[in-house]
Amino acid sequence: MELGLSWVFLVAILEGVQCEVQLVESGGGLVQPGGSLRLSCAASGFTFSSYDMHWVRQATGKGLEWVSAIGTAGDPYYPGSVKGRFTISRENAKNSLYLQMNSLRAGDTAVYYCAR
C-alpha cells in the first residue's frame, strides 16, 4: 500500500510541473492582390525571449515553405520571395510574434504557421 501511494504521489508531482508549448496564430483573412495582412502568434509554455522564432507556410498540395525568422535580439531573416514585402517582428513582453505582409500576391496564398 505504501508503494502504491508513493507512485501516485510521484505521478501527481510530474503532472504538476509539466508544461505544454502552445503557439496560436491569428489574423488571417481574404485580401485582394496588392493588399496587406498582419498575422499574430501568441506563445506560451516556454521562455519566448530565449528562442529564435519562425513563420512557415503551406500552400494546398505543397510542402512547408520557410517564410521568415527572427533571432532573440530581433534580427530578421527572409527568403528572396518575400524580402521587401514581409516584415517579421516580436514583442517579448507579450510573448508574441508578428508577420506584416504587404503587396500580397496570389502565390502567397497558404496556411501560415509560427514555429519555434
UniProtKB/Swiss-Prot annotation:
Signal sequence, renumbered to the chain: 1-19
Region (Framework-3): 77-114
Gene Ontology molecular functions: antigen binding
Annotated stretches, region: Complementarity-determining-1: 45-52
Region of interest: Complementarity-determining-3: 115-116
Keywords attached to this entry: Adaptive immunity, Cell membrane, Disulfide bond, Immunity, Immunoglobulin, Immunoglobulin domain, Membrane, Secreted, Signal
Compartments in which it is found: Secreted; Cell membrane
Positions of region (Framework-1): 20-44
Gene3D superfamilies: Immunoglobulins
Stretches assigned to the Ig-like domain: 20-116
Role description: V region of the variable domain of immunoglobulin heavy chains that participates in the antigen recognition. Immunoglobulins, also known as antibodies, are membrane-bound or secreted glycoproteins produced by B lymphocytes. In the recognition phase of humoral immunity, the membrane-bound immunoglobulins serve as receptors which, upon binding of a specific antigen, trigger the clonal expansion and differentiation of B lymphocytes into immunoglobulins-secreting plasma cells.
Complex and partners: Immunoglobulins are composed of two identical heavy chains and two identical light chains; disulfide-linked.
Name of this protein: Immunoglobulin heavy variable 3-13
Organism of provenance: Homo sapiens
